[in-house]
């Protein structure tokens, strides 16, 4: 997903990537929200129709060769943004056209201790 980074479900999380102190409690907290992000994403993409789009301001592929894209419903709901709003992801440190909006969504989630921002 373009512009967002969720905690890992299959490997250890590094709390410092999320601005959190490194502790067992925070690693466990991030693992919990990794599973919630996975469930949220699964439900989102199981809708009848979703659209995938790339961004001309961003690289098409990430460090692991994965396609980087926005995922939207036909009604215009954006998965990437919803993950940030819910506190299931952080803004990724790359260039893309929705960065300003995504930063704002992340900041609001942090201020309201949503999702992973309630860790620590």
Roles of regions detected by a PLM:
Residues 1-85:
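Electropositive
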Residues 63-116:
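Conserved beta-structured recognition patch
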Residues 119:
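Flexible, acidic/histidine-containing loops and adjacent segments that form or flank the divalent-metal
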